[in-house]
C-alpha cells in the first residue's frame, strides 16, 4: 500500500495519528513504514544516530492486524496503532533482550515484561528495542552496538542509560518511548535529547521482566515523549498492580482514572515551587563555563515558571544533601539477586549465575565501567549506611517541602551539556557528567523533566520537577503548564526530512 504523502510523521502526536486514522488519511501500516524509513535513513545511514538495536520483524504484520481490527470494530485501546520503542532492558517477546552487550545478544525471553504486555493490550506497536548503557547503566555505549550519537550534535553522547529511547523519540523514529531509571537514566537522556521524560513514584510501574531493578527498590520504567500529553497517555498504560512485583501493591489507590485529567495549561497558577540551586550533579564543575551555560537556561526557566503563575521560593536549601547523597551505594548481593529475580522469569536463561557471566570469554569485551559495576563486591556496612542516609534524606526532603508549603521542587535537569562521545569511552572519561541523583534515594517521589530551551552552543537543556510521593498527577500538571507556556521543544536538524 502506498504511503500517505499528506501526513507528516515528524513531531506527530498520539492525537494527530488517531485523528488521521479516524479520517482515513492514514493506516497503521503506512505509519509504521514511515518510521521504518526514518530509522533506515537516519539511524542506519546519514547521521547514523545508532539508537536502535533490534527492529521487530513482525511490525508491519502487527500493523495490518491493527488496521483490520480498526476497520471491524474501532480502536483496540488508547494506544491503537501507536509505534513505541522500548529500552533493551525490558523483555519484549519475539525480540532479544541484549542489555546492549555481546554477552546477551542471543537471549530471547519467552514472555513479555509486564509493561510490554500492557502496551500490546492498549494497541501499541512495539517497533524496536533501543540502545542503552551496557548492562543497564552509564552513558549509552555498549560492546554490541558501539556508541549512540546525539541528534543535536553527532560528536556528543545522548546520555544514559536510556539514551537510545531518548534519541529515537527526539529523532522521530517512533511516537513515544519507554526508558528505565535508577539514577538519572530517563531524565538525563531526555534532557540532552530535547524531550520530556518521567520517573514515576516507585510502585506505580511494575519491574516485572526488567533487568537490574531488583531486589532493591531502585529502578523503574518510565514514559518518554515529545509532549507531556503523550507522556501522560503512555503512563496510563504502563501503570498497574502486578502480583509478580510486590512493590506495585504500594501503588494501589494512587493511580487515577487517567493522568491526562491533570493536563491544565493554567496548572502553574498559584503553585508554590522551591528552586534548588545547589549543585547536586555527578562530577559537576560549578565553576566551569559549561556549567554556566546551563545556569543561563535555568535562570530563564525560573522566570518562565514565575510568568506562568507559579509562586517561586528561591532558593531553598536541603540540609545535608551532599553529605547524604555521597553515601549512596549498591546493596549486598545486588548483582546476584537482580540476576536471579530477572532470569528466574524465563526458562531460557543464558547464564546460570553472575559468576558464569564474568567467566565468559566475551566479558572482556564489555565496557570497562559496566564490568566494574557487575563485579562490584558487596559491602553490608556501606549498604546499611546508605539505607540510613536514604531514610534521613527522605525525611529532610519532605520537611523542606512542608516548611515552605511547596508543591514541587525545581532544579537543573542536568548540570552540564552533553559530553563528547570520546570522553565517555576511552579514559580519561566523564561518565554521567552533571547527572543529579537526588531521586536515587527518594524512590517514592515522582520526577519529570521538560525542555527548557537551548544553550549558547545550541544544545538542549531542561528543568526537573520533583514532587511528593505519589503526587505524579500534579507533577504532570506543572510540567504540562510549563510546556504550553514556553513550547521549547525543537526537533534536531540532523534528522529532518521524510
Set out the residue ranges of the language-model regions.
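Gly/Ser-rich, acidic/histidine-flanked active-site/gating loops
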Residues: 2, 10, 90, 96, ...
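Short, well-ordered alpha-helical
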Residues: 2-98, 102-105, 135-137, 247-251, ...
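Sec-exported extracytoplasmic/periplasmic mature domains
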Residues: 19-23, 36-48, 60, 64-71, ...
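Glycine-rich, small-residue loops and helix-cap segments
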Residues: 24, 81, 121, 127, ...
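Acyltransferase
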Residues: 32, 36, 64, 258-261, ...
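Short helix-loop capping/hinge segments that flank enzyme active sites or metal/cofactor-binding pockets
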Residues: 80-99, 264-283, 332-398, 449-459
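Short glycine/serine-rich loop segments
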Residues: 107-241, 442-464
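A short helix-breaking turn/cap at a secondary-structure junction
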Residues: 199-296, 486-498
Amino acid at each position: 500500500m502506498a504511503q500517505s504523502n499528506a501526513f507528516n510523521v515528524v513531531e506527530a502526536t498520539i492525537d494527530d495519528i488517531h485523528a488521521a486514522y479516524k479520517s482515513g488519511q492514514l493506516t497503521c501500516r503506512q505509519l509504521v513504514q514511515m518510521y521504518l524509513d526514518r530509522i533506515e535513513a537516519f539511524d542506519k545511514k546519514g547521521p547514523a544516530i545508532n539508537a536502535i538495536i533490534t527492529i521487530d520483524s513482525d511490525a508491519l504484520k502487527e500493523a495490518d492486524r491493527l488496521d483490520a481490527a480498526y476497520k471491524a470494530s474501532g480502536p483496540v485501546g488508547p494506544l491503537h496503532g501507536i509505534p513505541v520503542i522500548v529500552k533493551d532492558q525490558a523483555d519484549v517477546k519475539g525480540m532479544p533482550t541484549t542489555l546492549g552487550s555481546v554477552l546477551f545478544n542471543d537471549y530471547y525471553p519467552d514472555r513479555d515484561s509486564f509493561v510490554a504486555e500492557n502496551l500490546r493490550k492498549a494497541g501499541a506497536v512495539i517497533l524496536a528495542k533501543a540502545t542503552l548503557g551496557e548492562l543497564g547503566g552509564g552513558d549509552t555505549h555498549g560492546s554490541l552496538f558501539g556508541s549512540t550519537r546525539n541528534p543535536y550534535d553527532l560528536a556528543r553522547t545522548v546520555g544514559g542509560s536510556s539514551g537510545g529511547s531518548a534519541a529515537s523519540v527526539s529523532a522521530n523514529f517512533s511516537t513515544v518511548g519507554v526508558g528505565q531509571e535508577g539514577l538519572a537514566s530517563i531524565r538525563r537522556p531526555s534532557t540532552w535529547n530535547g524531550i520530556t521524560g518521567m520517573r514515576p513514584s516507585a510502585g506505580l510501574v511494575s519491574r516485572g521482566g526488567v533487568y537490574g531493578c531488583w531486589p532493591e527498590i531502585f529502578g523503574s520504567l518510565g514514559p518518554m515523549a515529545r509532549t507531556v500529553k503523550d507522556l501522560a497517555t503512555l503512563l496510563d498504560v504502563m501503570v498497574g498492580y502486578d502480583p509478580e512485583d510486590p512493590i506495585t501493591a504500594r501503588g494501589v489507590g494512587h493511580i487515577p482514572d487517567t493522568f491526562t485529567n491533570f493536563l491544565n495549561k493554567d496548572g502553574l497558577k498559584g503553585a508554590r515551587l522551591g528552586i534548588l540551586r545547589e549543585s547536586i550533579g555527578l562530577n559537576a564543575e560549578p565553576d566551569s563555563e559549561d556549567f554556566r551555560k546551563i545556569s543561563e537556561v535555568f535562570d530563564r526557566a525560573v522566570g518562565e515558571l514565575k510568568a506562568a503563575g507559579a509562586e517561586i521560593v528561591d532558593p531553598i536549601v536541603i540540609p545535608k544533601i551532599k553529605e547524604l547523597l555521597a553515601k549512596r551505594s549498591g546493596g549486598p548481593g545486588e548483582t546476584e539477586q537482580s540476576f536471579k529475580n530477572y532470569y528466574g522469569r524465563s526458562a531460557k536463561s543464558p547464564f546460570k549465575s553472575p559468576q558464569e557471566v564474568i567467566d565468559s570469554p566475551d566479558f572482556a569485551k564489555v565496557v570497562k565501567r559496566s564490568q566494574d559495576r557487575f563485579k562490584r563486591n558487596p559491602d553490608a556496612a556501606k549498604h546499611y549506611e546508605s539505607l540510613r542516609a536514604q531514610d534521613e534524606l527522605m525525611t529532610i526532603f519532605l520537611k523542606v517541602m512542608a516548611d515552605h508549603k511547596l508543591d514541587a521542587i525545581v532544579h537543573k535537569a542536568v548540570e552540564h551539556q552533553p559530553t563528547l562521545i570520546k570522553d565517555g569511552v576511552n579514559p580519561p572519561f566523564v561518565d554521567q557528567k552533571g547527572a543529579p541523583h537526588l531521586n536515587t534515594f527518594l524512590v517514592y517521589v515522582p520526577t519529570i523533566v521538560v525542555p527548557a530551551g537551548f544553550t549558547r552552543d545550541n544544545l538542549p537543556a531542561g528543568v526537573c520537577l520533583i514532587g511528593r510521593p505519589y503526587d505524579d498527577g500534579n507533577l504532570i500538571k506543572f510540567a504540562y503548564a510549563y510546556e504550553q507556556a514556553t513550547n521549547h521543544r525543537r526537533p534536531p536538524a540532523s534528522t529532518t526530512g521524510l
